């Protein structure tokens, strides 16, 4: 098919109507003969009135003629998704037509986004936008809403089950979980050590020594332990926080030995 010839004939037909809609007794839409995305202007000689069906066909032909124009492919895609005929009915789309426009639109959209992400300015603006509390809240709300839908849950479940059936996936997941848990425990230890270092007092300075003594005495309660170490020159106190820390370290040590 000679798409250019068909397009020109369609435009000639539309030109006969002029541009005054009030003189027509049927629905029409204004169409740029040379679309603005490829250099067209808004002058009257570049405009024509087409019926909804003709307008749809015109953009289909333009997408065929200018196959690598992102703007025209997007316009074509928009007609397929949002177009209506003169009676307000959604424009029907064949499976072949849908596949063609979807694949082309997807490819062009992907290339466009790749080019945009190469721009430092775009990445910076995107980062600022996504960091806004109201935007983050909307994204989170949208994701939670989507994940709570039964069909989405089922799809996720099937995807996870299928993934675990692939060779090596289960082993990799297990290793990642163990690594994550080890990192968590290491950070927790570091955090506790930091807290201990930040505390003042002779009993905190001698923490390791007193912890070993507490273990040797069969982990006495704070009153008994306080009385014992006061005889060693430490101030009289109930040592509540010290014993709490001892118990946390003791439990953690036992858990590590059992794992």
Curated annotation (Swiss-Prot):
GO terms for molecular function: endonuclease activity. InterPro entries: HNH_nuc. Coiled coil: none annotated. SMART domains: HNHc. To phage T4 mobB and mobC. Keywords: Endonuclease, Hydrolase, Nuclease. The lineage of its organism: Viruses, Duplodnaviria, Heunggongvirae, Uroviricota, Caudoviricetes. It comes from Enterobacteria phage T4. This is Probable mobile endonuclease D.
């Amino acid at each position: 098919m000679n798409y250019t010839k068909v397009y020109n004939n369609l435009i000639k037909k539309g030109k006969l109507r002029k541009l005054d809609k009030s003189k027509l007794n049927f629905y029409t839409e204004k169409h740029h003969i040379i679309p603005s995305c490829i250099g067209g202007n808004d002058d009257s000689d570049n405009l024509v009135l087409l019926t909804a069906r003709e307008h749809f066909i015109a953009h289909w032909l333009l997408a065929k003629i200018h196959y690598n124009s992102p703007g025209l492919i997007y316009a074509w895609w928009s007609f397929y998704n949002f177009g209506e005929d003169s009676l307000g009915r959604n424009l029907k789309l064949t499976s072949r037509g849908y596949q063609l426009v979807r694949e082309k639109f997807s490819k062009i959209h992907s290339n466009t986004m790749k080019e945009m992400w190469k721009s430092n300015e775009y990445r910076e603006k995107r980062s600022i936008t996504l960091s806004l509390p109201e935007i983050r809240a909307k994204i989170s709300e949208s994701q939670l809403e989507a994940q709570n839908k039964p069909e989405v849950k089922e799809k996720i479940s099937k995807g996870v089950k299928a993934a675990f059936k692939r060779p090596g996936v289960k082993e990799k997941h297990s290793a990642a979980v163990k690594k994550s848990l080890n990192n968590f425990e290491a950070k927790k230890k570091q955090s506790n050590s930091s807290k201990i270092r930040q505390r003042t007092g002779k009993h905190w300075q001698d923490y390791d020594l007193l912890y070993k003594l507490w273990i040797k005495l069969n982990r006495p309660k704070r009153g008994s332990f306080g009385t014992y170490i006061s005889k060693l020159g430490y101030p009289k106190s109930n040592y509540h926080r010290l014993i709490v820390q001892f118990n946390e370290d003791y439990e953690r040590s036992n858990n590590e030995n059992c794992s």
